[in-house]
C-alpha cells in the first residue's frame, strides 16, 4: 500500500485570464498558493518580500503574459519624513487613536465597510460583499493579523490606549518579521477633509518605526492608475523590479 505524505513545499496555481481592474483593455492572470498550517506566517513573510499579497488564506501575485505594470511597493519606515501636507493630516487627526484587536469582525465594522464601499467603490469587485464575506475576509487568516480600529480619543485614552464613540476607520494589517502589511483599509466617507486613508498609512509608519520594523507594505502600484497614485507619495520607498527591491525617492 502506497503512503502519501503531505508536501512541505507550497503548490502554486495559475488563474484563467480576466479583465484587468486597473488598465482598460488589458487582461490579468495571477499565480497563487494557500497559506495554511504552522508555516503559514513564515511563508507569508517570504512571499510578501517576493511581491505577493495576501487575501484571506491565499497569497497571490500578478502573472500577466504581456504586462508588468503592477509594481510591489514598500515604504522605508525608519527613514520616512512626512511632507508638510502629511504633517497637516497628522495634526488634523491628532484627536484619533488606533487600537489593535484580534482579527475578529463586528457588525459595527461591517456597517462602516458597507458605507465605504457604497460611497467609494460602488462598481468595484467587492461591492456585493455580504456580512459573511466580510467575516471571511477578516477571520480567514493563518498569519498574525490585526484589526486596527480608529476612534476619537477620550479622557482615559492615554491610559487605556483605546478610543471612544463611533468607529471612524479600520485597517486590516498583517504583522510580519520585517514590517507591517496593510491588507485592506476603509473609513467614514463623510469625513473627506480628514484624509483618513493617508492618515492610516502614516499611523502604520509610526507603528512600524516604534516596533523597530523597517517596512510598511502597500501592495501594488500601477503607473497611470489614478486610484493607486497615492502610494508613491510616501518616500523614501522601494519598488520590486527584476533586480530586486530598488530605492525610490
UniProtKB/Swiss-Prot annotation:
This enzyme's EC code(s): 2.3.2.29
Record has Zinc-finger as a keyword: no
Broad enzyme group: transferase
Enzymatic reactions: N-terminal L-glutamyl-[protein] + L-leucyl-tRNA(Leu) = N-terminal L-leucyl-L-glutamyl-[protein] + tRNA(Leu) + H(+); N-terminal L-aspartyl-[protein] + L-leucyl-tRNA(Leu) = N-terminal L-leucyl-L-aspartyl-[protein] + tRNA(Leu) + H(+)
Keywords carried by this UniProt record: Acyltransferase, Cytoplasm, Transferase
Top-level taxon of origin: Bacteria
Coiled coil: none
An example Gene Ontology molecular-function term: arginyl-tRNA--protein transferase activity
GO terms under cellular component: cytoplasm
Main location as per UniProt: cytoplasm
Entry function: Functions in the N-end rule pathway of protein degradation where it conjugates Leu from its aminoacyl-tRNA to the N-termini of proteins containing an N-terminal aspartate or glutamate.
Descriptive protein name: Aspartate/glutamate leucyltransferase
Organism annotation: Chelativorans sp. (strain BNC1)
Taxonomic lineage: Bacteria, Pseudomonadati, Pseudomonadota, Alphaproteobacteria, Hyphomicrobiales
Encoding gene, per UniProt annotation: bpt
